Amino acid sequence: MAPRGLLVLLLLALVGPCAALIRIPLTKFTSTRRMLTEVGSEIPDMNAITQFLKFKLGFADLAEPTPEILKNYMDAQYYGEIGIGTPPQKFTVVFDTGSSNLWVPSVHCHLLDIACLLHHKYDASKSSTYVENGTEFAIHYGTGSLSGFLSQDTVTLGNLKIKNQIFGEAVKQPGITFIAAKFDGILGMAFPRISVDKVTPFFDNVMQQKLIEKNIFSFYLNRDPTAQPGGELLLGGTDPKYYSGDFSWVNVTRKAYWQVHMDSVDVANGLTLCKGGCEAIVDTGTSLITGPTKEVKELQTAIGAKPLIKGQYVISCDKISSLPVVTLMLGGKPYQLTGEQYVFKVSAQGETICLSGFSGLDVPPPGGPLWILGDVFIGPYYTVFDRDNDSVGFAKCV
């Protein structure tokens, strides 16, 4: 072989196994809450289960992990596929930037665990790369504790193979949320600080194993309910076909969740919230935008929303096109949301109703108050999560 050819091979060997871009198509599905609404079933009280997200915050010292969020996934709307084991056992998961652990149902789940019976289950005996761990784990949700034990195996995402990933095998899943869920489990993509049992999060393993060229991942969430794919998770870069213009960046202010500083929330009719600035979390695991209850009530009034039941607000469907623009200021840049973008249309018992995409949620100090920017915000704005620079970038979706 010519010396030049040998040099090329040597350079390739030195570069290592880095992949260019890993594309994971996301499927959009009807959230559990909306599905229950459409069939007229009882919806768990939002206040009783702290609405869409509840945080067990009393942040620990920096040397200690922050206590895990208390969270439910009644409003999750996007999932993708991963594999666990060799050969890969397939699971659908919510890629959640609001938590840090990976878990899927276990073949050892309790006989009466209906959620487990209805979903794919991991079977260690069928994997040649399984390594026993056995540590018990529990994640506390508003409806109870999801519990099980830890195991270690290879996780496949696209054409990436992430070795030695510790994950949870769930043997008990609480409440109706996971029974009705279209997804099998959760893949957390937040920082190690909030990882239960100090497990190394999935994306941290990707970084440590140098599997991608840039330690970033990005989300495109298609808000058109009839379009496919429902969205895309991209590891290692961004996809220009989904956005226009340059990214505007904001620094992460607390490396636990993807938490950033928000300058203000402005309604076109003159109302300003988050005066003087506030903290916000960018969270792909929930669909709504939440904020302190008192402020969100003012916001609902300003957009003409009326209280319905259990924390939900209804808006007259024929007024959507004339609703005031709501502008979130981040890093000195305005991010506008129109009525078409912050209102959901839901079919309920043969009738169509329109629900506000905002919800009240009080997160106590020292962690709060907080705003949560879910899919209502991420949908119109292509979002990049950058671990190299601990920042979040936004660009307008096309």
Curated annotation (Swiss-Prot):
Domain of life: Eukaryota
Tissue expression notes: Oocytic yolk, preovulatory follicles, liver.
Statement: the UniProt record of this protein carries the keyword Ligase: no
Entry-linked SUPFAM superfamilies: Acid proteases (SSF50630)
Entry EC no(s): 3.4.23.5
Cell compartment(s), UniProt: Lysosome
GO cellular component terms, semicolon-separated: cytosol; endosome lumen; endosome membrane; extracellular space; lysosomal membrane; lysosome; membrane raft
Pfam families: Asp
Single Gene Ontology MF annotation: aspartic-type endopeptidase activity
Sugar-modified residues: 133, 251
UniProt keyword terms in alphabetical order: Aspartyl protease, Disulfide bond, Glycoprotein, Hydrolase, Lysosome, Protease, Signal, Zymogen
Propeptide stretches in the record: 21-63
GO biological process: apoptotic process involved in morphogenesis; autophagosome assembly; execution phase of apoptosis; insulin catabolic process; insulin receptor recycling; lipoprotein catabolic process; positive regulation of apoptotic process; proteolysis
Recorded catalytic activity of this chain's protein: Specificity similar to, but narrower than, that of pepsin A. Does not cleave the 4-Gln-|-His-5 bond in B chain of insulin
Domain (Peptidase A1): residue spans on this chain: 78-395
Disulphide bond pairs: 109-116, 274-278, 317-354
Active site residues of this protein: 96, 283
Similarity remark: Belongs to the peptidase A1 family.
Subunit relationships: Consists of a light chain and a heavy chain.
Function: Acid protease active in intracellular protein breakdown. In chicken it is a key enzyme for yolk formation as it is capable of catalyzing intra oocytic break down of protein components of both vitellogenin and VLDL.
Entry protein name: Cathepsin D
